Structures are given as structure tokens and as C-alpha cells.
Amino acid sequence: MRVIFTGGGTGGHIYPIMAIIERLKERGISTNDKILFVGTKKGLESKIVPAAGVNFKTINIQGFNRKHPLKNFETIKLFLQATKSARKILKEFKPDVVLGTGGYVSGAMVYEAAKMHIPTMIHESNSVVGLANKFLGHYVDRICYTFDDAAKEFPEKKKLVKTGNPRSQQVLSLHEEKIDIKKKWGLNPDMPTVLVFGGSRGALAINRIMLKSLMNLKTKPYQIIWATGTYYFDSVQKKLKGVDIGTNIKVLPYIKNMPGLLPEMTCVVSRSGATSIAEFTALGVPVILIPSPNVTHNHQMKNALDLEKAGAALVIPEDDLNPNNFVSSIDHILLDEKYAKEMSQASKALGVPDASDQVIKVMEEISR
């Protein structure tokens, strides 16, 4: 089976594909000649995909400008040019199936493949359907999804297949290499521990609330691993200079082996991107979610509310965030073992441990 994957711009579009590719490799499908990833030169995928040893090609495309509609004439022109580039790639590679996860590059590639009668499918990771996937839903053979709210947005009900997020299965296969928090950071493995992080670059709002809450948190009977993000680490370190933060708080720039750390955590404080949620639910980790307001269609809030509704998360909107509700939310989970266990069970019930296999099954069903 020859496969073209396409998607880009954000990790939520890229990591599900990388998880599927890893599973295909485990099944003996070579990344050398059977798999191709099509993205953009400027997107995050241009770094992640080649570094993983996966064949990578680019097409030139850009998103719609909602603030300056007149600039969208150029966007439409680029889209038409991109479909020509897509057709050339499709003719050369001759895929048996094309899978898109979102982003404008996905729109051009999957649309052109459908026009050429190549089997096509999309995967939607968020609870709010992105513009590209909403457009492609009319043309593809199958629509895979994670959240039930996303399924409601597609009128093409016969095409829908609930698969979960492929990142879930990948995380479960990785978490065997657990991090020894005592050996690595001198922390007590028998004490409740919370991980606070805002992604690899970090989140300003989360770092600010941590700085405001430190004097309270350092007196608590639990430990905190605070990953500031690489972008904010130096500025946080400057603000902490000469400040006694106690022995129960460890400040780091980022966590390299997240799947190895998550199983050791009693609770996590995080944004609510689709990839992060897939990791939390795969491992059944209770979470306090502070959704980013700076995302399209406020999809992080919708993702977070889905988890809260299931009893797997507490949600604090960024505008409502203050030291009182922040610390009391952490206390609620870390100091109430019964509640933490109930949250963990609810979280695990949402995870799909074989999500990659389910997506691959759909690929095999429709491939030519």
C-alpha cells in the first residue's frame, strides 16, 4: 500500500500522521518508497517529518486572511497553483490512498486526489472541525474523527468512522521507558506530583499564574514539575533569582520524554490541544486544562469542555485564572485520592488505545 499523508501548520495536524507512519513501519511498510508526506516549507512539518526519516515534499499555499479579505485573492490564486503541484506529485507517486489531517496544504492535496478518483480520507483531531476538513468532507471517501462534537458538523454521516487520535496508541507504546523522578530531579516518587506545562515553547498565562502562586505552592504536601517552555525559561529564571521556591518545586525548560513522565504524574496542568488530550486520555491522567484563547474557532475550549463533561478534567478559562482557583484546583485533585482515581478512570475511558490501527484499517478498506 502506497500512502500520501498531508497536513501541516500545527502539531495537531502533524503528530497523528507521524503516529500512523510509525505504526505502518512496525507492520513492515517502508518509509523509503511507500510513504510520502506533503506539507509546506514554512510549517512545523518541514522540521519534524524529514528528521524522522520520512520522504517529504512541499507545495506553496497559504491560509485565508480573516482580517484583510482583499489579500485572499492571492490565497485563491495560490490554491489553484497548489492543486496543479498536487496533481504532479500524485501522478509521480501513484498512491493507493491519500490521508489529510487539516491545514490548507491538506485541502489542496486531498481535493486534487479526489478529483483524480484516488481513494481519500481525512482525520479530525479536534472537537471543532477545521476549515480544510469541513471543505474536504464533501469529497473524501471516509471521515475519521476523535470527538463526537466534530462528527455532528459533517452532514456526510455514512462516511464517518470514530477512530480516536492515533497519538494515543503511540504514547502507550512509548511510556514503558518511565522517568525516574528521584534519580533525575531528586523528587520523592511516593509523593503526589503535578506537572505544569504549556507546550514546548510554553504558555505565558500559565507561567504567570505559577509565578503568582509560588509562595502558596511551596508549602503544599505535594511536588511540582514546572516546564516553562524553551521560549520563557530564561525570563522565568531571572524572576526567580534570589527567590526561595522550596524543595518541592522543580523548574525546567521542557520535558523531552513526555510519555515517560506522564504515567508518574498524579495530575497535569496544561493547554488543551488535540495531541496533548490524546496523550492524557491514553494514560488516564487527571488534568486541569487552561485552554488557549488564541486558536481558530476557540477549539481548545471545546476540547477541554468535552473532557470536563466526561469527568476527566477541570477547566479554568484563561480570563478567569487567578491564584485562588488555580491552587484550589490542584489541591482538589492531589489531596483527594478518591477524586483523582475517578478522574483517571474517566480519562482512560475516553482514550482509544488502538487508534492508529483503526485509522490504518480504514485506509486498507478504501485503498485501490
Curated annotation (Swiss-Prot):
Pfam families: Glyco_tran_28_C, Glyco_transf_28. UDP-N-acetyl-alpha-D-glucosamine binds at T10, G11, G12, N126, S200, I255, Q300. InterPro entries: GlcNAc_MurG, Glyco_trans_28_C, GlycoTrans_28_N. GO terms for cellular component: plasma membrane. It is found in: Cell membrane. Cell wall formation. Catalyzes the transfer of a GlcNAc subunit on undecaprenyl-pyrophosphoryl-MurNAc-pentapeptide (lipid intermediate I) to form undecaprenyl-pyrophosphoryl-MurNAc-(pentapeptide)GlcNAc (lipid intermediate II). PANTHER family: GLYCOSYLTRANSFERASE, UDP-N-ACETYLGLUCOSAMINE--N-ACETYLMURAMYL-(PENTAPEPTIDE) PYROPHOSPHORYL-UNDECAPRENOL N-ACETYLGLUCOSAMINE TRANSFERASE 1. This is UDP-N-acetylglucosamine--N-acetylmuramyl-(pentapeptide) pyrophosphoryl-undecaprenol N-acetylglucosamine transferase. It comes from Lactobacillus helveticus (strain DPC 4571). The gene is murG.
